[in-house]
Every structure is written in structure tokens, then in C-alpha cells.
């Protein structure tokens, strides 16, 4: 009789819930075997669910693949709402039908997983571009226009010219066909990839600013108006990276 360890190793090779080998081990009365079967089936179902989710997030891309459009750039931004720091946009071109496990809207992914998924995107992407507009630009032209500028810069920094743009809730003044998608980071893998790249990039910038301007907890709050950040403003005042057109900074001038 095979040991539980040996059976576990065999179960790991099964990837189909309809595989006939399940029946062979289902009759094994050992608790360890039954536990291993349940766990393996759970893992397979989880993988199937993830595959289905990723497939659903390729709907917009697949419509373009049918038209032989393969160089599709997903574009997203991070940092519209914070009181401090830049707005950062990313443009990402993934290979056709590329599925990166657990890729989703950055807001739906635990922060501890951001770096791993970010690295997977960099490893698999055909091209990645970043655009950054600082707080001065945001104050000069407003956050909406600064976001557009950051997105256009991100596209211009791609090493490959895209054939089509999938953009999260924006239309850009660029001579490239584009599709505006509401909640794009939750509905397109290309845009989700851009959201992760933008998020990790901006978090690193804000972490560096935390060292330069201690007392505001920028590495924790990324410039958003948390209690700790607002207390820092009251205690230490405004830094050069604060957005002077945003309240409560505007009223502190």
C-alpha cells in the first residue's frame, strides 16, 4: 500500500476534477489521504476559478485580437486623491492572451503581494512606460489635467508603439485608437497591470519622501490625508511636495 506521502505526490500531478484516479484514492479510509484529496480538489477548483476570472478580464483585449490588433497598452494612474506627492501613470503592453496569476485592480490585492505581481508584470510585459507629474504641475493645471499628462507621458515612454489603448475612464489626446473603460482596472488585465506598476512605483516614491520629510508617515499613507498625516501638517507645516491647491493645505497658506 502506498504511503500517504506517496499519494500526496501523486495527487499533485492531477489537474482535472474528472480524473479517474480520484476514485482509486477515494476508497482509502486513512484520514490523511482523505484530507489530502479534499485539499488537492480545493486547490484545483481555486485554479479553475482564477483561470475563469483572468479569462473574463481579457474580454476587451480579445475583441481587439480578433481584429489582429495585438500591441494593446493598458493605462492607469495612481495618486489623484492624496494631499502630497505626484500622480503616477503607467502604460503596459502584455503579450497576447497573457494571464498573470492573481493580477487584478491594485486596490483589490493585498499590499504584500504587490511586489511579486509587479515583478511578474515586468518579466512578461512587451513594454512598460511610466509618467509622473509632481505636485507643482497638479497645482498649476489641476489634478485631472495632470493625470492626463502623466498618462500621455507613460505612453511616450513605451519602447514599443501601441496599436490600441485601453484606458481607465479617460480619453487621451493621442493619435492612437483607444477605448475608455469605466472601472477598467477591474475589467481589463492590461489596465490592471498598469495599475499595479503605477501603484508600486508611486509607493516607492512616497517611501523615499518619508525619509526626506519625516513626521508625515508618507511610507504608510502614500500622501493620503490620514490622521497621522494631518497631525504632521499641524506640527511641522507644509512640505514642497504638498499640493497647495488641495484642502486643508490651501487654507494653511
From Swiss-Prot:
Domain RNase H type-2: 70-253
GO cellular component entries: cytoplasm; ribonuclease H2 complex
Matching Pfam families: RNase_HII
EC category: hydrolase
EC number annotated for this UniProt entry: 3.1.26.4
Keywords, in A-Z order: Cytoplasm, Endonuclease, Hydrolase, Manganese, Metal-binding, Nuclease
Subcellular location: Cytoplasm
Co-factor requirement: Mn(2+); Mg(2+)
Cofactor binding note of this UniProt entry: Manganese or magnesium. Binds 1 divalent metal ion per monomer in the absence of substrate. May bind a second metal ion after substrate binding.
GO biological-process terms attached to the record: DNA replication, removal of RNA primer; mismatch repair
Molecular-function GO terms, alphabetical: manganese ion binding; RNA binding; RNA-DNA hybrid ribonuclease activity
Binding-site list for a divalent metal cation: 76-77, 168
Main location: cytoplasm
Catalytic activity of the protein: Endonucleolytic cleavage to 5'-phosphomonoester
Entries under PROSITE patterns matching the protein: RNASE_H_2
InterPro entries linked: RNase_HII, RNase_HII/HIII, RNase_HII/HIII_dom, RNaseH-like_sf, RNaseH_sf
Family indicated by similarity: Belongs to the RNase HII family.
PANTHER family xref list: RIBONUCLEASE H2 SUBUNIT A, RIBONUCLEASE HII
Record function comment: Endonuclease that specifically degrades the RNA of RNA-DNA hybrids.
Protein name per Swiss-Prot or TrEMBL: Ribonuclease HII
Organism expressing this protein natively: Streptococcus agalactiae serotype Ia (strain ATCC 27591 / A909 / CDC SS700)
Gene, per the UniProt record: rnhB
